[in-house]
Amino acid sequence: MGFVLFVIIALTIVLDQISKLIVARTMSLGDSIPVLENIFHITYSVNPGAAFGIMAYQTTFFIVTTILLLLVMVFLFYRLGQEFQIVKIALALQFGGAVGNLIDRIRTGYVIDFFDFRIWPIFNIADMAIVLGVSILIYFILFMSKDYGCFD
């Protein structure tokens, strides 16, 4: 399973960074390409904050916090037993997404976003991986944790 987790993390980081590179090299900041007019666009945007732009320009805080959370995730990878593979997959998605956005913050001080559904803040592949990982973790906690003897 370790190899699968490595692939999830690596694939998340690579897809995230390549997609951001393509957007940054082929579009100007603010450009928007309609994929489905008024529903889904590729829009080149930068976010110096967290989700929804909160705490903008707190780059050092985000870098330090992300590194600390990554260390916690590494600890959890080693601490969780084989029976918690679904939790490890959730953590791998979050880990890959966090590293993808961390690379941006270290390199530029902001995160490149481009998926634009017009009714929601613009986001990227790293954000999608983090949200998917958190969603899997919430599902596990709500519906599966009793089967594993958690929270007894």
From Swiss-Prot:
Transmembrane intervals: 3-23, 57-77, 83-103, 122-142
Keywords on record: Aspartyl protease, Cell membrane, Hydrolase, Membrane, Protease, Transmembrane, Transmembrane helix
InterPro entries linked: Peptidase_A8
A single Gene Ontology CC term: plasma membrane
Pathway: Protein modification; lipoprotein biosynthesis (signal peptide cleavage)
Catalytic activity: Release of signal peptides from bacterial membrane prolipoproteins. Hydrolyzes -Xaa-Yaa-Zaa-|-(S,diacylglyceryl)Cys-, in which Xaa is hydrophobic (preferably Leu), and Yaa (Ala or Ser) and Zaa (Gly or Ala) have small, neutral side chains
Pfam families: Peptidase_A8 (PF01252)
HAMAP family, sorted: LspA
Protein family per UniProt: Belongs to the peptidase A8 family.
Protein name (Swiss-Prot/TrEMBL): Lipoprotein signal peptidase
Organism field: Natranaerobius thermophilus (strain ATCC BAA-1301 / DSM 18059 / JW/NM-WN-LF)
